[in-house]
């Protein structure tokens, strides 16, 4: 037989029924939720308050002496905000943001009706002094940022200018070297040309001398051959004349001419 599901009018009735069932089974249910929550708050809330007190000292140093009142709520808010900030941010920027957030919470507490201080004029003077101090601090930080930006820009500009000047000076320094190199190349070219011309002149002189020598030798050979030819002709002529005389004598003796 299936049990029908009970319906309860309130959570309290359901809780009482649950306790009865657990006790019938011999169990002791834990129903002190409020007590556990209070114990948790006492343990962890106290730690949070203790951890937040050193951060409240920073605000006490900024405010004038005798007018400082700590606010654990603002410090706990700053602590939670610091935990939520990303880890890559610098410590200086995170502190500045925490200071601004904590002081904004402090001003809200000053002007809100929740923590009504006994001396309202004193808190107003504290809030006004904080606003003046924060304005001066922001102005100084902005001036520092602008001066650092200007200094970095000036350094970069000077560096570029120096590089450009060095780039301009380098060709001027290299010009004499280039000129000397060009002059040396021209001298070498002239020397090469003079050597080539001297070689060609010597070659032409040699060729001309050889031609003259050959001509002289040819002429001498021609003269010698002509002399030999004349000598032969003369000898032949003389021989011819002698034969004719002999022939004439022979003819006279034999033939009777």
UniProtKB/Swiss-Prot annotation:
Q: Region Disordered: which residues? A: 145-257
Q: Which organism is it from?
A: Bos taurus
Bias regions of kind Basic and acidic residues — which residues? 163-176, 183-193, 200-212, 219-228
Coiled coil ranges: 210-248
Kindly list the cysteine pairs connected by disulfide bridges: none
Instruction: List keywords of the entry alphabetically.
Output: Coiled coil
The Basic residues compositionally biased stretches are 152-162
Protein name (record): Lysine-rich coiled-coil protein 1
Which superkingdom, per the lineage?
Eukaryota
